[in-house]
């Protein structure tokens, strides 16, 4: 299925504006872990076609901006970044490309509004990137068509690109079949397509062979995975891969959290005691307008079953504040839920109306869809975040004096320290050198300090 926009041929570049030797690509990634994984795939793909990775945009011959459209602010960040890269294009003759969800949603507007963008492409077109780069030397265009589900080919990771890194993302699926009223993802990522489980397991095995210890399975809604087995079964298969010590995944929809998945947390120690389970609101009325397909009580039932199956599990969540029609009582419900659940962390944002979504189309059409004044929404968000900071600080303080396992990910920004994470995904600054805590090692650490968002410790 093709969705192609082509503009007039480009004028020839001035002599000497782009070197003939091996070129460099700089990737600026916005948004989610799926985007981070896509960026890795794009760098690997271009690496097979004589592109090296540029550490700064000033050294790049191709600048790729991999975008997020979940909130309007992300689009504003894109336009700001494009303005900064315009000078690099003028000086080096660099190509500028926009990929990801904003590219999928706003292809025509981007090409018209930003004349120095050379090409635009959606998430389903990553595999064509080398051909698109060559074509962009001749003309400006957008390629944002969807691949049919049966024809979709997941980009293959190059395990060598992960050598020396202890962690890696592994794509399990893409797209989303839910129709949450606030969410643009089904319009920018398409329908759900699951990757066949043997392919996922094989990639995890190849990553383990080059030293990866932890894999994170990613998708817009991994709980609905259907690649030849259930998601719970997939986790058990990955856990059987020699060399893989830790398994994480994201993101999940509470409606699809099965008893079988809860059982995996109970039975499989390689599946880390950390679960991101977005709730969005503590009000049944707001959840219904959001089309989330669960009530607060149903969410808490799943939450409690996870806690019972894996005592000590760190559960994180998302909140949207200021959704249309949210009253003070609705917001108080979110605060009450936060206090009841004691989430390890929550990612909370103001409601951002997105094109084509139900919430955007219904905004202002009825009393229950009235827009919340920004000042009211901002004040509520500040209250929610203050409560979350207090709860998170208490959770970190409770770790003082404990001996925990830390996967060392590399050097810290502070001299004489290494950086790693606990099974619960808590960041630990470890007072050790490379010899005492090499990258990829699982070390025991005694926690000596709890900060606002991280821990400090010494080898135990």
UniProtKB/Swiss-Prot annotation:
Broad EC category: transferase
GO MF annotations, alphabetized: 4 iron, 4 sulfur cluster binding; metal ion binding; N6-isopentenyladenosine methylthiotransferase activity
Principal location listed in the UniProt entry: cytoplasm
Residues holding [4Fe-4S] cluster 1: 32, 68, 101
Binding site for [4Fe-4S] cluster 2: 176, 180, 183
CDD domains: Radical_SAM
Gene3D superfamilies listed in its UniProt record: Methylthiotransferase, N-terminal domain, tm_1862 like domain
Domain TRAM: 397-460
Record's protein name: tRNA-2-methylthio-N(6)-dimethylallyladenosine synthase
Family annotation (InterPro entries): Elp3/MiaA/NifB-like_rSAM, Methylthiotransferase, Methylthiotransferase_N, Methylthiotransferase_N_sf, MiaB_methiolase, rSAM, rSAM_horseshoe, TRAM_dom
Entry keywords, A to Z: 4Fe-4S, Cytoplasm, Iron, Iron-sulfur, Metal-binding, S-adenosyl-L-methionine, Transferase, tRNA processing
